[in-house]
Amino acid sequence: MAKQYDVLFRLLLIGDSGVGKTCLLCRFTDNEFHSSHISTIGVDFKMKTIEVDGIKVRIQIWDTAGQERYQTITKQYYRRAQGIFLVYDISSERSYQHIMKWVSDVDEYAPEGVQKILIGNKADEEQKRQVGREQGQQLAKEYGMDFYETSACTNLNIKESFTRLTELVLQAHRKELDGLRTCASNELALAELEEDEGKTEGPANSSKTCWC
């Protein structure tokens, strides 16, 4: 039976509550948009498989709660992330200003070399804009990140931003991937990366199993 994917990566969505992280996740994984969502409690995740540079990548995308009371829980998930989206709402100057705090959390809790992309979400709400595109571009430049303005409502730059972060993670792990490619006798092949510790972590949804 052919493998369904070659490698599994964990991506993380972080940012203030209400910036649209869950909407981004649902649009990318299910191509669905709901104008109202109950705030995420702790963490949740969804999966999607895409192909990048001939490699089938299984993406496990974790959606973290932005409320302060959940920070102790959500920070535990930083350490196993290969890629992180830092999300703000273009109609909320406050959420933009808080990106500096989120970057500080990433620097403290995420592994060295984790790949990052800055997202200015809700680009469809132009009439409510409080943060200019140039501000987002400048902040991303300061932190050495790629930048996208997105809209889960209109599907603007959703596939592009998720694909780009996956590409960055693949590039960062190129040596491991190339090494695993040469191990033709290894049944796990590229998927070995997901089982480096051989144990599960407890997600918010107990019916799902995480092997990364």
UniProtKB/Swiss-Prot annotation:
Record-level Gene Ontology MF annotations: G protein activity; GTP binding
A Pfam cross-reference name: Ras
Assembly and oligomerization: The GTP bound form of RAB15 interacts with REP15. Interacts (GTP-bound form) with MICAL1, MICAL3, MICALCL, EHBP1 and EHBP1L1.
Compartment annotation: Cell membrane
Activity regulation, free text: Regulated by guanine nucleotide exchange factors (GEFs) which promote the exchange of bound GDP for free GTP. Regulated by GTPase activating proteins (GAPs) which increase the GTP hydrolysis activity. Inhibited by GDP dissociation inhibitors (GDIs).
EC number(s) given by UniProt: 3.6.5.2
GO biological process per UniProt: exocytosis; neurotransmitter secretion; positive regulation of regulated secretory pathway; protein transport; Rab protein signal transduction; receptor-mediated endocytosis
Sites of S-geranylgeranyl cysteine lipidation: 210, 212
Positions bearing Cysteine methyl ester: 212
Similarity field: Belongs to the small GTPase superfamily. Rab family.
Residue numbers covered by motif Switch 2: 63-80
Binding site residues for Mg(2+): 22, 40, 63
Description of its domains: Switch 1, switch 2 and the interswitch regions are characteristic of Rab GTPases and mediate the interactions with Rab downstream effectors. The switch regions undergo conformational changes upon nucleotide binding which drives interaction with specific sets of effector proteins, with most effectors only binding to GTP-bound Rab.
Membrane topology listed for this record: Lipid-anchor
Reactions catalysed, as given in the entry: GTP + H2O = GDP + phosphate + H(+)
Keyword field contains Amino-acid biosynthesis: no
Keywords, in A-Z order: Cell membrane, GTP-binding, Hydrolase, Lipoprotein, Magnesium, Membrane, Metal-binding, Methylation, Nucleotide-binding, Prenylation, Protein transport, Transport
Motif range (Switch 1): 31-45
Function, as annotated: The small GTPases Rab are key regulators of intracellular membrane trafficking, from the formation of transport vesicles to their fusion with membranes. Rabs cycle between an inactive GDP-bound form and an active GTP-bound form that is able to recruit to membranes different sets of downstream effectors directly responsible for vesicle formation, movement, tethering and fusion. RAB15 may act in concert with RAB3A in regulating aspects of synaptic vesicle membrane flow within the nerve terminal.
Cofactor annotation: Mg(2+)
Tissue-wise expression: Expressed predominantly in neural tissues.
Gene source species: Rattus norvegicus (Rat)
Ligand binding (GTP): 17-23, 35, 39-40, 66, 121-122, 124, 151-152
Protein name per Swiss-Prot or TrEMBL: Ras-related protein Rab-15
GO terms for cellular component: cilium; cytoplasm; endosome membrane; perinuclear region of cytoplasm; plasma membrane; presynapse
